[in-house]
Structures are given as structure tokens and as C-alpha cells.
Amino acid sequence: MVRNLKAIILAAGQGNRLKPLTDEKPKCMVELFGKSLIEHQINAYKSCNISDISVVTGFRNDSITISNVRYFRNERYQITNMIESLFCAEKILDGDVIVSYGDIIFEKNVLKLLIQSDNDISVIIDKNWKDYWSMR
């Protein structure tokens, strides 16, 4: 069965813990190995044949200029959370949708596992999350 998957990347936040790197750009635009975090994600999606990609922006939305991507804006990003950002893209929340945070990197093989899931709802987690969380 071929699925028509969509991706929504939540990228509205500034990333206060990453200052000064995020003084003038959102955290999804911080570079790692010569590409922004969001570019790494978009490349992973495209490598898995997901081309219907939307980004919910907020802080310095003008600095996210990726072509062939649909944009939504959370005007209230400073006082809301990721759920509210997701609802900014509510009109496309039908069918099979993958939601990711704009400040993470995942490998293509992890995305492939998610795509192969037959479940109605699937979540990919890092079992070592607590170690990373405690470093915050």
C-alpha cells in the first residue's frame, strides 16, 4: 500500500537555551555540519519520498526560507506551546501526518521505521531521553 504522507515541522520557538546562537534566528536554523537543523529534517523526509512538507513558524519567521515548503505562522508563539503551533496547520491535519519538532535531527532509518508502522498512531522515542533531559 502506497501512503500519501505529509510532514509538519513545528519551528515556532526561539530556543532560549541556545542563546546567543538564537538571538537573530530560530533554533531550527542553527547549523550542524553545514546545514540548518530544519534542512537536515527536510532532507530526511525527501529521502523517504515525503514531499508534502509544512513548517509552522513563529520567531523570526522571515529567516526560514526553504523552497517547496508550505508555511503556517503561530503569531502567538511567545505565549503558546507546540500544540497551539500544530493547530496553526489544522487545515492539513487529515490523512497520514508525521509531526516533528524543528530542533531535532533524526536518521533516515528511524523515519523509515515510522513510515512502516501499521498503527493508527505511532511515536518514535529515544530511550535515553532522560540523560539528555537532565543536561538541560
Report each predicted region and the residues it spans.
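Canonical Radical SAM [4Fe-4S] cluster-binding loop centered on the CxxxCxxC motif
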Residues: 20
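The conserved acidic donor/metal-binding loop of glycosyltransferases
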Residues: 102-104
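Conserved core of the sugar-phosphate nucleotidyltransferase
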Residues: 67, 107-136
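Conserved N-terminal catalytic core of the sugar/cofactor nucleotidyltransferase
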Residues: 2-9, 17, 31, 35-99
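Active-site micro-motifs of SAM-dependent methyltransferase domains
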Residues: 16, 106
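Short alpha-helical oligomerization interface
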Residues: 23-28
